[in-house]
């Protein structure tokens, strides 16, 4: 998971968006403070009367301005930028949660594939042993050639199923390589070292969750903060249609000297006072900007509602899948146990001649199907817990325990 967070492009994009939002927030906060600028110049020129008099002049100026936030536009802009920064941070958390869940689900799929492959390999050994014994009986004249064909075909079927399962396991490894950014040898080494760590889901039943768990989802929090930013932008746009008041100040230092030994004339001047800007005519531009801000708010509100509805649906659907898988697991364990016993009994009967090969192969298919079904259900149950972790936004257990 750590490797996935370090190397995943989605997380890198989320980090870049956070940096951009943080810079924008800093720029907006700076608008509430005075600005001070300085300038300096020096010039030298000759007179136009043909004389040799050279005039040198120097000028230095310091300008200061401070906009008075009469209508709260600057404060609204700061709220909007802060909300956008929080929204981008929540999107980063959402990306991390999504990547963690995807890595976990792929890891579970790989371990389940390993279990399937092991079961199929054991089945292949059993099929090949049956084929070997049947061939001996056929050559000795105690069994019909058709029975040899059947067992050989059964062994071939088992081998191709095992090969397909091994290929699926390799595909899961390829997915982990893409998710984590590790090389394939590194990924295989990590999986081999942690082979004893098998995914295990909790055993308790969960039928409902507090509604507060929805609000802690990063995507819901991001949508809510985006809505807050859009609301603040309406205040900014409306305030732009009102008069603006600023305090302006200026200090200038100058010096003039003629060529020769003439003295240098120095001086300074200053000014300070308010400046009032009145929007008189702009061909409806400011009104249009206010309408745009309102439309953006309506869009953000609709998106927030959609995100919340989708979040509720995702949590409820995951709970249904989780509880159904948990109930099915009990019967799957029973089915596997009984089909194992049935196959062993059929194998013993077939070797004593009281059961046909068709009965044995039917028992084998049922045994393998029950074992594969149990493995798939275990994977489904575990991945349902992972999906629930993602659906409620990640570390919901800690928050629930704290409450």
In which residue ranges do the predicted regions lie?
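Bacterial Sec-pathway N-terminal export signals of envelope proteins
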Residues: 1-24, 142-144, 198-228, 279-280, ...
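Small/polar, glycine/serine/threonine/aspartate-rich low-complexity segments that form flexible
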Residues: 2, 39-63, 186-206, 231, ...
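Amphipathic alpha-helical coiled-coil segments
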Residues: 11-14, 21, 81, 88, ...
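Sec/SRP-type N-terminal targeting helices
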Residues: 12-13, 29-30, 68-96, 122, ...
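Periplasmic alpha-helical coiled-coil/stalk elements that build and connect Gram-negative outer-membrane
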Residues: 74, 90-209, 321, 325, ...
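Hydrophobic, well-ordered secondary-structure elements that form the walls
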Residues: 213, 247, 276, 293, ...
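Gram-negative outer-membrane assembly/targeting C-terminal domains
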Residues: 387-403
């Amino acid at each position: 998971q750590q490797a996935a967070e370090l190397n995943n492009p989605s997380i890198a994009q989320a980090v870049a968006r956070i940096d951009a939002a943080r810079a924008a927030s800093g720029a907006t906060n700076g608008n509430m403070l005075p600005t001070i600028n300085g300038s300096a110049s020096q010039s030298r020129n000759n007179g136009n009367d043909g004389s040799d008099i050279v005039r040198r002049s120097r000028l230095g100026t310091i300008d200061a301005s401070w906009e008075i936030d009469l209508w709260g536009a600057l404060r609204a802009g700061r709220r909007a930028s802060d909300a956008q920064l929080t929204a981008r941070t929540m999107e980063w958390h959402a990306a991390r949660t999504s990547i963690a869940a995807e890595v976990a689900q792929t890891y579970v799929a790989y371990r389940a594939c390993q279990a399937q492959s092991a079961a199929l390999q054991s089945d292949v050994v059993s099929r090949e042993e049956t084929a070997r014994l049947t061939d001996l009986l056929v050559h000795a004249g105690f069994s019909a050639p058709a029975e040899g064909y059947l067992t050989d075909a059964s062994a071939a079927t088992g081998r191709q199923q095992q090969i397909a399962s091994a290929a699926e396991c390799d595909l899961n490894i390829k997915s982990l390589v893409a998710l984590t950014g590790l090389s394939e040898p590194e990924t295989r080494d990590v999986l081999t070292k942690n082979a004893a760590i098998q995914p295990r889901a909790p055993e308790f039943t969960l039928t409902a969750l507090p509604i507060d768990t929805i609000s802690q989802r990063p995507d819901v929090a991001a949508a809510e903060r985006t809505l807050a930013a859009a609301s603040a932008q309406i205040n900014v746009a409306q305030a732009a249609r009102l008069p603006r008041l600023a305090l302006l100040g200026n200090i200038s230092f100058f010096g003039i000297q003629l060529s020769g030994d003439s003295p240098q004339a120095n001086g300074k001047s200053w000014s300070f006072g308010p400046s009032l800007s009145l929007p008189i005519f702009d061909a409806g531009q400011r009104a249009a900007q206010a309408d745009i801000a309102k439309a953006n708010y309506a869009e953000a509100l609709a998106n927030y509602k959609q995100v919340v509805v989708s979040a509720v649906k995702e949590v409820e659907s995951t709970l249904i899948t989780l509880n159904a898988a948990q109930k099915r697991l009990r019967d799957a364990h029973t089915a596997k146990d009984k089909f194992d016993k049935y196959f062993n009994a059929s194998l013993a009967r077939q070797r004593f001649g009281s059961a046909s090969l068709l009965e044995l192969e039917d028992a084998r298919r049922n045994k393998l199907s029950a074992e594969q079904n149990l493995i798939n259900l275990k994977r489904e149950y575990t991945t349902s817990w992972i999906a629930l972790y993602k659906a409620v936004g990640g570390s919901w257990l800690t928050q629930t325990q704290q409450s």
